[in-house]
Design a protein with these regions (language model features):
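Extracytoplasmic ligand-binding site segments that recognize negatively charged/polar headgroups
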Residues: 1-88
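Short secondary-structure boundary segments
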Residues: 7, 32, 96-97, 156-157
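Periplasmic-binding protein-like
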Residues: 62-67, 73, 106-129, 165-167, ...
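Alpha-helix capping/helix-boundary segments
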Residues: 80, 97-99, 149
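A ligand-binding cleft/hinge motif common to bilobed small-molecule-binding domains
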Residues: 85, 90-108
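Mature extracytoplasmic/periplasmic domains
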Residues: 119, 123, 128-174
């Protein structure tokens, strides 16, 4: 998870707590409703971790968003490419790889991952035991977790699950 922001319109945050400051009034949004959207729920979970809470008890994240709302800093607008581009959502809590994509439309868009709120989520991969071609499914899995497959995730802006091992092995593609 990350904090994406338009550096031409708001100061660079150095911590999640910065979003409670007056200069962020009416500018902070989530990518959806946390009761319905995984990215938004993970924004609340990130706030929980940043505020000394946990993933098992996200009440500190809920409290953080109550503070954001009562200060007038949180806006109940679902962040999207369009709202970032038109300036409605100048600060967005979202997956870093999704937020990084906003740079295409807003060159001053920056992405920040707070040190005290590092939170990741990975896609689950499975092979159905009833698959018509289980060997092909296994080969696909093998490819996804190969250096080549992981570098494709990286090219798409995601952080591959094997990135640390690939960095040590020198197999991460150079940008």
């Amino acid at each position: 998870m990350s904090i994406g922001y338009d550096s031409a319109k708001v100061p660079a945050p150095t911590a999640l707590a910065d979003l409670l400051k007056a200069e962020y009034k009416g500018k902070v949004a989530l990518n959806g409703d946390p009761t319905r959207a995984n990215a938004a729920l993970n924004g609340v979970m990130m706030a929980s971790v940043a505020n000394g809470g946990s993933l098992d008890d996200i009440s500190k994240g809920v409290d953080f968003f109550k503070q954001l709302k009562s200060s007038g800093n949180f806006i109940p607008v679902q962040a999207s490419t369009a709202t970032i581009k038109n300036g409605t959502t100048q600060v967005v809590l979202d997956w870093d790889y999704l937020s990084a994509g906003a740079v295409k439309n807003v060159p001053t868009w920056k992405v920040f991952v707070p040190d005290n709120a590092v939170l990741g989520g990975y896609y689950a991969q499975a092979i159905n035991k009833e698959a018509p071609h289980p060997a092909a499914a296994r080969l696909w899995q093998e490819y996804l977790y190969s250096d080549a497959g992981q570098n494709l995730w990286l090219k798409g802006g995601a952080r591959p699950v094997r990135m640390d091992a690939m960095t040590k092995a020198g197999t991460v593609d150079k940008a």
